[in-house]
Amino acid sequence: MKTLIARHKAGEHIGICSVCSAHPLVIEAALAFDRNSTRKVLIEATSNQVNQFGGYTGMTPADFREFVFAIADKVGFARERIILGGDHLGPNCWQQENADAAMEKSVELVKAYVRAGFSKIHLDASMSCADDSIPLAPETVAERAAVLCLAAESVATDCQREQLNYVIGTEVPVPGGEASAIQSVHITQVEDAANTLRTHQKAFIARGLAEALTRVIAIVVQPGVEFDHSNIIHYQAQEAQALAQWIEKTKMVYEAHSTDYQTQTAYRELVRDHFAILKVGPALTFALREAIFALAQIEQELIAPENRSRCLAVIEDVMLDEPQYWKKYYRTGFNDSLLDIRYSLSDRIRYYWPHSRIKNSVETMMVNLEGVDIPLGMISQYLPKQFERIQSGELSAIPHQLIMDKIYDVLRAYRYGCAE
């Protein structure tokens, strides 16, 4: 990461896409996509997804590292080319607890990530806890971030410190996605970004962390990109020029969250304007969902009724029976809920792929389709871009490859934006 940031600050057009997903097919796609390049791949876990108690994936940071490395070994991607990051490390998961208890858990969270070899650490203590004011004072946020940084430094080996990098600050939306429709977004003001940096510098120095400050490579801001269930707010470069000019006076770059669904031109403009770390998550699993839905439609036409996976029906049944991951985000009417469950850009389905019933139905569908020849006309109907690549000899009509290539479509846009 340090080399990439140095190259960007030296004037090169270079950025990096941060893959924020724990889905094995998404991670496989991210690694396979860059297998034959010289680029490193940045894969990040969030604090609610992976933590010392297992998170919603059931994985600790060490478990997640081994999970990613096993996929890398399978696809032939060198482990040393993987950068592991921890996103929103702080009280995010424990906001319902008092601040002291939440921060104790947050300290252990950061230690677990660093011990597991994660080298990009987002110190985010911006969330109010049960006994806090809303919003927190910037000074309190910075003081807590310094406590978390101290925790990281206390367990990092000398070798780890050479690679260790910190990201500070936070964007406006809550981690995990918008809960309601958006019409506009508040772009971070220069004075707020400057205040974030100033308060963190002061808090770090007060705790004897002056050297650790040199490891702060990025600040999270809102450049004016966001999405909800059916709306996308696109990057307007002219609106972010004050931010772009301010960061040039520092040794840092920006990290932009929720960059999913922007155009490839927007990614290039974002990197040009020093938003050099572009985070993506739901767009990748949305592409995965599109591929699985397309294959499910193909299965319905090619496979005898008694042998079908009923994949789409199973997904719907499970999500209606167990609505905890989407209920507070999606619309309330039954038909509206079904549309959001299937097609929302927020892609809450991503929380359900590990469910045993859904996992088994997808596996059945894949086995069914691997045993038949899929007519080209059907691929053209349901996966038109993949049809074109099959026609040009770049791709085979194999279900797994079709899913991979569908995810590659998202990664291709980021590569266009980030490539030197």
Curated annotation (Swiss-Prot):
It comes from Escherichia coli O6:K15:H31 (strain 536 / UPEC). Belongs to the GatZ/KbaZ family. GatZ subfamily. Component of the tagatose-1,6-bisphosphate aldolase GatYZ that is required for full activity and stability of the Y subunit. Could have a chaperone-like function for the proper and stable folding of GatY. When expressed alone, GatZ does not show any aldolase activity. Is involved in the catabolism of galactitol. One of its GO terms (cellular component) is plasma membrane. Keywords: Galactitol metabolism. Forms a complex with GatY. The keyword Zinc-finger does not apply. It comes from the Bacteria. The gene is gatZ. GO terms for biological process: D-tagatose 6-phosphate catabolic process; galactitol metabolic process; phosphoenolpyruvate-dependent sugar phosphotransferase system. PANTHER family: D-TAGATOSE-1,6-BISPHOSPHATE ALDOLASE SUBUNIT GATZ (PTHR32502:SF12), N-ACETYLGALACTOSAMINE PERMEASE II COMPONENT-RELATED (PTHR32502). Pfam families: GatZ_KbaZ-like. This is D-tagatose-1,6-bisphosphate aldolase subunit GatZ. Pathway: Carbohydrate metabolism; D-tagatose 6-phosphate degradation; D-glyceraldehyde 3-phosphate and glycerone phosphate from D-tagatose 6-phosphate: step 2/2.
